[in-house]
Amino acid sequence: MQLIRGLHNTQPYLSGCALTIGNFDGVHLGHQAILRHLRQKANALNLPMAVMLFEPQPREYFMGNKAPARLMRLRDKLHYLAQAGVDVVIVAKFDRTFANLPAAQFIEDWLVRKLNVKFLSIGDDFKFGAKRLGNFAMLQQAGKQFGFEVEDSRTFCLDELRISSTAIREALAKDDLQHAENLLGKPYRIFGRVIHGNKLGRTIGFPTANVRLHRQVNPVKGVYAVKVRLDRKSTRLNSSHSRAS
């Protein structure tokens, strides 16, 4: 899988693609179904399959620390997108300039001229461009004008519940890890780097490890029984998580 950081770096690496746009936070079962369908369309059109992400995520840019907790880091998201067979991931920097970009300019400059999109899969509630004036109908009209197909990415449900990153965050907030796993299609995982702490564990006779999660807000809190693998050996431990990181 090829990673392109910044829309300005798309050429000459990419010219023509089957594209979807979104946060893909968690790469859950709904995302996986969208990607499978996009793979089929890309193969039929003999085009690379591309995903456009935003960093930071738009809500993080506008809401800061009040934004919903991420389910996974960008690094982990890229791992799962590669597993799903994505050919190219474009990570667009979401900053003031991008936030103020008129919707029509985003379509013409980026989707048409830079990416030469031939097929676009997007949610019918997708909003984009300055003041969120761009929408699904606008993309459909642009598709007719510039020669690319626009398709509504379907909403997927499990037991009549819409699969979404929000639903997974709600399950985690209720400590319902099994339901979160059902929606994700995989166990919920947290990755981080062990860092130096205050070494308080040495004073109470218990070894401890501080793991930095590199996120503003954690989607889980509480104390969990965990299993740690070290040098091919497993050890049962307790893990404590707070909402703030």
Regions found by a protein language model. Name each.
Residues 11-73:
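N-terminal catalytic cores of NTP/NDP-binding nucleotidyl/phosphoryl-transfer enzymes
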Residues 28, 81, 120, 180, ...:
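Residue-level signal for inorganic ion chemistry
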Residues 69-77, 101-107:
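Glycine-rich, highly charged phosphate/nucleotide-binding loops
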Residues 237-245:
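Single conserved hydrophobic/aromatic residue that forms the stacking wall/gate
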